[in-house]
């Protein structure tokens, strides 16, 4: 999957979010790559503060260009879960995680900044900060039974390349999210002092 395909798959989705006033940001491997830890992926993770009242309009805007599971979208918006969109032209999968609305989620959304995706700077999308990407990956790592080497090395890689990492911010949210022990371990694996 090329960066051009990624941009082609993401642009209509984020434009639809923008037109509906839905705050969003990219996370996962796309965010890791934007912060210097490149990893190929066949999907993109998007966190969106999607209200159930906007699902039908979102589905109408994306219909024809995407596989749009309207019922799953409604359920995800109500239950604050996830759903998948598939861009039919590229078969690129977009995992949309409806924001849980926790203080951490609101903080991550507020700290997201625009980043260009691809070698030509195609498409500027809101991307989670490096710190929020680390914290989200620590949460996923814990929820997954602490077994995903890919997640772990993304976390360690982000800490290695992040010379200007906001340590007090990381520490505050790691404590709040219950992943402080994992953050300590990741700092050590990244070759830093705790």
Regions found by a protein language model. Give the residues of each.
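Compositionally biased terminal segments of proteins
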Residues: 1-194
